[in-house]
Structure formats: structure tokens, C-alpha cells
Swiss-Prot record:
Role of this protein: Displays ATPase and GTPase activities.
Transmembrane regions listed in the UniProt entry: none
The species this protein was found in: Geotalea daltonii (strain DSM 22248 / JCM 15807 / FRC-32) (Geobacter daltonii)
SUPFAM superfamilies per the UniProt record, alphabetical: P-loop containing nucleoside triphosphate hydrolases
Annotated protein name in UniProt: Nucleotide-binding protein Geob_2284
InterPro entries: P-loop_NTPase, RapZ-like, RapZ-like_N, RapZ_C
Keywords for the protein's UniProt record, in alphabetical order: ATP-binding, GTP-binding, Nucleotide-binding
Family of the protein in this entry: Belongs to the RapZ-like family.
Chain sites annotated for binding GTP: D59, I60, R61, G62
MF terms (GO), sorted A to Z: ATP binding; GTP binding
Residues that hold ATP according to the record: G8, L9, S10, G11, S12, G13, K14, S15
PANTHER family (UniProt xref): RNASE ADAPTER PROTEIN RAPZ
Pfam families linked to this entry: PapZ_C, RapZ-like_N
Length: 285
């Protein structure tokens, strides 16, 4: 049986994720005490009607969530079940805005402000976050994009936990992507931004791509970066990692990082992996 543990900050999109999983045929259980996880899994596993996919929501509403979760996860895994922990996160500013829109009280505090609740919740969830299989930053996602991402994660993990690679470009000016497993800084490469006839185009434009790739340091970097990925990917697969996020950053996220991400896309196409490519800040930079 495949089990997804859905956890993370209040206001980060867990409810949306659960609805997406229900649409994909997952049996979902919300707010179950951690101590009851093994019993619940046994009951579902022995049910007359075979259930293959289960999602359990675990957050601060269950007051004992911080007690013994490591042991509980170990018990479930040793019973032969595939367990992935999806931790949903977002920036404080985005969560504050979402609470303001819904006018809900933050569940981490009985009184006080939403920012205080967020700080408290981050502290309480720090240990659980370290166990996450995948950290999902929903700050820049709308409801439909989040549902699509969750579904791609689920489908990418089917069939023997085949690994899905999310390759994204970004701009340091707009902050690091929280969900990154690997971050590569390409700000040392020649910058088309300072070439007047290239400045207004993105890294998807053939002229910008040709400019970045014609320099010797770009070719040498790509060779070494691909060698690093050749070394790392088998290790991540052996670990059982089902989703790998590689973030490539330049100053504004419009030129160099886009070119390099597209070059690495071609490299991954030959690896028979599930591949998702996005350019987070291309239209901002």
C-alpha cells in the first residue's frame, strides 16, 4: 500500500492537496492522531475492499503530532508500505494574505496575531519538516497549479517509484525556491542583460541562447554540471527519492538561468525520467 503523509503550515494548501488526491482515488483521512496511524493503516490494509493509495493529514491540530512520529513512520515502513511525506510551505507574507482573505484564526495560537501563529507553527513543525520526502512551496501557485503539481507528484511516483525531476529557473532577486533539493548559481556566466539588442528577450530566444552558450566558461560549466548530475541521480534513486527539484538561478531569472535550464532539459530527456520544467521568474526579470 502506498501512503502519503500530508503536512505543513496552516494556509499552505494542504486542503487543496487532499481534494486533488481524493480526485485521484486516494482514501484520505484528516486530523488522525499520530499514535493511531499504525492501527489505521492495519485496518485499511486488511479491509475487504482493497485500498492501494492512502493519504493521511498530520498537522498541529493533532496535539500529539510531535510525539513519536519518527517511530510511527518507521513502523509503517517496516510493515512493507511505501511512505512519502509531503510538507507544504509558503512565505509568511503569502500565508498572512491568505488568512486575511478567509478571516480565519490561526490554529497555532488561542490569541494574538497571525504572524505570531506562523512563527509558533514553524517552530513546532521544524522536526517533522526535516523528515519530508518533498517540500512544496505554494507561494507562487494558484489552486489549479497546486492541484496539477500534486497530481504530477502522485503519478510520477507510480510504477515502482519512478523519479520525477522538477527543473526550474529562478531569479535571486525574487528569493530562493523553498522546495529546492539542489541549487545551482549561474550568475558567473556572461549576462545578456547588458547587451542592448538582447536585454528585452528571454532565455528561450535563440539569440540569447546562442550568446550564453558561445562562451567557453558556459561549455565547461555544462560539462561539469552534467557530470555532477550523472553522479547524483543514481544515489537519489537508490535512496527511493520520488521527486527531485533542481533550481538554477541567475540575478533576475530571465536570461542565463533559463538558457541553462533548457540545456539541462535536453540532458534529462535522454535519462528516461519524468520531467517537469518551469521558469518561475522569467516574466518578472
Amino acid at each position: 500500500m502506498r501512503i502519503l503523509i500530508i503536512t505543513g503550515l496552516s494556509g499552505s494548501g494542504k486542503s487543496t492537496a487532499v481534494r486533488a488526491l481524493e480526485d485521484e482515488g486516494f482514501f484520505c483521512q484528516d486530523n488522525l492522531p499520530v499514535a493511531l496511524f499504525p492501527t489505521f493503516v492495519d485496518l485499511v490494509d486488511n479491509a475487504k475492499e482493497r485500498i492501494r493509495d492512502v493519504a493521511l493529514v498530520m498537522d498541529i491540530r493533532g496535539r500529539d503530532f510531535n510525539k513519536g512520529f519518527e517511530k510511527v513512520f518507521q513502523e509503517i515502513t517496516e510493515a512493507g508500505h511505501l511512505v512519502d511525506i509531503l510538507f507544504f510551505d509558503a512565505t509568511d507574507e503569502v500565508i498572512i494574505r491568505r488568512f486575511s482573505e478567509t478571516r480565519r484564526r490561526h490554529p497555532a495560537i488561542d490569541s494574538g496575531s497571525v504572524p505570531e501563529g506562523i512563527r509558533s507553527e514553524r517552530q513546532q513543525l521544524a522536526g517533522l519538516r526535516s523528515f519530508a520526502t518533498q517540500i512544496i512551496d505554494t507561494s507562487e501557485l494558484n489552486v489549479h497549479q497546486l492541484k496539477d503539481l500534486v497530481i504530477s507528484l502522485v503519478k510520477g511516483g507510480e510504477g515502482g517509484r519512478e523519479m520525477t525531476v522538477h527543473l526550474q529557473s529562478f531569479g535571486y532577486r525574487f528569493g530562493l525556491p523553498l522546495e529546492s533539493d539542489l541549487v545551482m548559481d549561474v550568475r558567473f556566466l556572461p549576462n545578456p542583460y547588458f547587451i542592448p539588442e538582447l536585454k528585452e528577450f528571454s532565455g528561450l530566444d535563440p539569440k540569447v541562447r546562442a550568446y550564453v552558450l558561445k562562451h567557453d566558461e558556459t561549455g565547461e560549466f555544462l560539462t561539469k554540471f552534467k557530470e555532477l548530475l550523472e553522479f547524483l541521480l543514481p544515489g537519489y534513486k537508490r535512496e527511493g527519492k520520488s521527486y527531485l527539484t533542481i533550481s538554477i538561478g541567475c540575478t533576475g531569472g530571465r536570461h542565463r538561468s533559463v538558457v541553462i535550464a533548457e540545456e539541462i532539459r535536453d540532458f534529462f530527456k535522454r535519462k528516461q525520467l519524468n520531467l517537469k520544467v518551469s521558469h518561475r521568474d522569467m516574466e518578472k526579470g
